[in-house]
Amino acid sequence: MARVKGGVVSRKRRKRILKLAKGYYGAKHILFRTAKEQVMNSYYYAYRDRRQKKRDFRKLWITRINAAARLNGLSYSQLMHGLKLAEIEVNRKMLADLAVNDAAAFTALADAAKAKLGK
């Protein structure tokens, strides 16, 4: 039986990894072993940061809502509690958008929350 040489398969495998590593800095897009390590790390970072992004945006929204709430004489937690008591269901993304782009609407929501809190 003839000996099977894996040249074609190996070259295809290496080319696939090096293609994925295109644009990486230094030897990481040239040398197969370092490119392979970097591609594996890149997949790990992408997986991790897709989840981290959700947390980061929520933090950003809360920060923006808190800043706008304090301009209206409430803390973030007081505003959220007041909105819940007033049975106003607005998610944090929409509240943050209102805080940045439509201050009058946000003030109206803050006033409704204040009324329910008795302030």
UniProtKB/Swiss-Prot annotation:
Alphabetized UniProt keyword annotations: Ribonucleoprotein, Ribosomal protein, RNA-binding, rRNA-binding
Domain of life: Bacteria
KW Amino-acid biosynthesis (keyword) present: no
A molecular function GO annotation: structural constituent of ribosome
Swiss-Prot/TrEMBL GO biological process terms: ribosomal large subunit assembly; translation
CC annotations in GO: ribonucleoprotein complex; ribosome
A Pfam short name: Ribosomal_L20
Cited HAMAP family: Ribosomal_bL20
Entries under NCBIfam families matching the protein: rplT_bact (TIGR01032)
Family per similarity comment: Belongs to the bacterial ribosomal protein bL20 family.
PANTHER family in alphabetical order: 39S RIBOSOMAL PROTEIN L20 (PTHR10986)
UniProt function note: Binds directly to 23S ribosomal RNA and is necessary for the in vitro assembly process of the 50S ribosomal subunit. It is not involved in the protein synthesizing functions of that subunit.
Designated name of the protein: Large ribosomal subunit protein bL20
Organism listed in the record: Streptococcus sanguinis (strain SK36)
Phylogenetic lineage: Bacteria, Bacillati, Bacillota, Bacilli, Lactobacillales
Record gene name: rplT
